[in-house]
Amino acid sequence: MNKRRANGSSHSTRPVRTGSPKWVRFSREEVEMLIEELAKKGYTPSMIGIVLRDQYGIPLAKPIIGKKVNQFLKDKGLASQIPEDLFNLIRRAVNVRRHLNEYPGDKTAKKGLEEIESKIRRLSRYYKRVEKLPQDWTYDPAKAELLVSASS
């Protein structure tokens, strides 16, 4: 019954491989340097992976550097305080709230905002449980708008 709000299932299947492909020309140090440069430019971990794949021909960073991009950024102190998926939901909620200020009669957008904020609360509860967020962290729309505008 809850199909409307379900996440999509369309995706490609990753090939099963333990090491890095033979045709990748970059060494471990070069890939680490690329990831650091992209992170300092403000790219998110998923965008770093897309840039590495599309512009440099590196299908996955993990077999080359031995860690996931997010873990590498955390070790270097370049990871963000709020997990990327939660931050993207917060950004969506801020955009929908901005839309509702302009068009207050949009009932569909109101329902969408309720669903997004519900998802934010569920995800934040999970991140508190696994200690990726501080226990006193709460979602506040006013603070969320400041957070999103500061990161832009």
UniProtKB/Swiss-Prot annotation:
Disulfide bonds: none annotated. InterPro entries: Ribosomal_uS15, Ribosomal_uS15_arc_euk, Ribosomal_uS15_N, uS15_NS1_RNA-bd_sf. One of its GO terms (molecular function) is structural constituent of ribosome. PROSITE patterns: RIBOSOMAL_S15 (PS00362). Pfam families: Ribosomal_S13_N, Ribosomal_S15. GO terms for biological process: translation. GO terms for cellular component: cytosolic small ribosomal subunit. Residues 1-20 are annotated as: Disordered. HAMAP family: Ribosomal_uS15_A (MF_01343_A). Belongs to the universal ribosomal protein uS15 family. This is Small ribosomal subunit protein uS15. It comes from Metallosphaera sedula (strain ATCC 51363 / DSM 5348 / JCM 9185 / NBRC 15509 / TH2).
